[in-house]
């Protein structure tokens, strides 16, 4: 499950991506992003800072400053964003790619039935989420539908 913070990050990125598609895109202020996305302004400052550190958005200072999308939507991986904003996405620490830890109460990972069941579910989830980009989210309809058709 993604956190509310992640949902706010995605809403902000979708607004920035929509703005980038315009004929004359402008940097958006935090206030504009908050209004357009329905996201509380107080959360956006921290979220946009995280996204800037991740190299996804740029911040422009000054009178006509604000935020703009730095990467093309097709280059913004949803799974990387989730990991950046929410942390590891694995259901068990022993399945995590980025934060692997053996389970404290497990003596034999290879024989662990809990791990085996959750590994199958998790790998299916990874196939889907690792293939999704911000561009998929911008597309009309269900972004997962095109993956299921292939």
Curated annotation (Swiss-Prot):
InterPro entries linked: TR_Rrf2-type_CS, Tscrpt_reg_Rrf2, WH-like_DNA-bd_sf, WH_DNA-bd_sf
Example GO molecular function: DNA binding
Gene3D superfamilies assigned: Winged helix-like DNA-binding domain superfamily/Winged helix DNA-binding domain
Cross-referenced PROSITE patterns: HTH_RRF2_1, HTH_RRF2_2
UniProt KW DNA-binding keyword: yes
Residues in the signal sequence: none
Pfam families (UniProt xref): Rrf2
GO cellular component, one term: cytosol
Ranges for domain HTH rrf2-type: 1-139
Keyword terms of this UniProt record: DNA-binding
NCBIfam families, per the entry: rrf2_super
Protein name per the record: Putative HTH-type transcriptional regulator rrf2-like
Organism taxonomic ancestry: Bacteria, Pseudomonadati, Pseudomonadota, Alphaproteobacteria, Rhodobacterales
